[in-house]
Amino acid sequence: SDVYKRQLWYNALRFIADLVREGGNGLLADSLDAQAEVTGKSFVEVFRNEYGYLLDYVDGNMMDWSVRPNMIFTVAFDYSPLDRVQKKQVLDIVTKELLTPKGLRTLSPKSGGYNPNYVGPQIQRDYAYHQGTAWPWLMGFYMEAYLRIYKMSGISFVERQLIGLEDEMTSHCVGSLPELFDGNPPFKGRGAVSFAMNVAEILRILKLLSKYNL
């Protein structure tokens, strides 16, 4: 199973439990919370490894040890089966191996099969898409995760990260961001010249920052 799917399921259980509790159905809420407890414990046992990051995929004895950005959702979401120390370990490895000025790499340079350049024929570009190119929309969840861990002290870092994306607003499609970037310097913009999901995530982070700056 994919790590992000399991995290989405855990988050959904906790979210619905809170909703039904507010609606007055305490028994159902308690049942959902109990299921979430079991799910969360299993999540940590299955996906967290001795290096402090999360396996990207597990199916029986088959485990994907690649360092990929899907684990950042476990730190960014409202509900997580990880404790604060575990969340920080995940954030640290994402920062060290996946963070670029333009987004998060889809694969760490230290992992096998790394291909940061979205160039060449279609089949070659398709391979690079998930093997090392940087996706700006993932930066939104990364910055949200960073603020969850560091709170007010993380604001200046997040604001500096946004500068790297501001420069792109006049480089491709004015007022927008391209679909993706090469994972290595000079981080050239690639794909569609304007990608709504990227813009939406940056706007969401600006809104989140405004709450801290009140």
Regions found by a protein language model. Name each.
Residues 6, 13, 139, 143-146, ...:
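TPR repeat positional signature
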Residues 6, 132-136, 192-196:
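Short, conserved micro-motifs enriched in small and acidic residues
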Residues 196-214:
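Terminal, non-catalytic domain-edge segments
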Residues 117-152, 203-207:
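C-terminal substrate/ligand-recognition segments
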Residues 146-171:
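C-terminal hydrophobic structural anchor segments
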Residues 10-92, 96-111, 115-117, 160, ...:
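Catalytic cores of carbohydrate-active enzymes
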